[in-house]
Amino acid sequence: MKYDIFISYRRVGGFETAKHLYDLLRADGYRVSFDIDTLRNGDFDIALFKRIEECRDFILIVDKHAFDRCVDNTFDRKKDWLRCELAYALSQGKNVIPVLLSGVDSLPDNLPEDIAAVVTKNGPKHTIDYFDAFYKKLCNQFLESAPSSVITFSNEGEFKTNMDDWNRPTTKVGKFLSDLFKEK
């Protein structure tokens, strides 16, 4: 299945907003990748990067602690999925849309080089009090994807047959993973 939108978030601080957006966007006909509802067993990392590659829009849910691990030099960057997802989306030229949650007024200016470009991206400010206005603005002004009239689901067998190709370092995902995990 090809996705229009990938949602990236921290489980603590961003899950509720991410899940709410996922439900609304799906109901409106967008094909949305949301890890908990749409990923199955297998190579989790490869499947995530493949989905980012397929999508046009990358929504980044930013709570007040979203970038704490990213700027912590003691934290293993290979275990920081938000950073890995964001770095890959930026490297692939995706339409990155940061959604700033309550308590976040701007993105930090001390981000690592692989994700620093996110500070140049614009997105709607999320407010619970004016959620409908936020959602309308997100869909009408920031998303490049258009809703699909028909949502199709592929079976796991079809998806699995192509997974071996994503392990090869000659593909974009393979090269990115190889670069990401090589020792420094």
Predicted features by range, described:
Residues 96-100:
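Conserved beta-strand/loop subsegment of P-loop NTPase cores
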Residues 11, 102-105:
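Short glycine-enriched loops at secondary-structure junctions
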Residues 109-124:
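Von Willebrand factor A/integrin I-like adhesion domains
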Residues 47-50, 75-77, 112-114:
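Short low-complexity, flexible loop/linker segments enriched in glycine and/or proline
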Residues 40-43, 64-94, 104-108:
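Conserved TIR/SEFIR loop-to-helix hotspot centered on a Trp-containing motif
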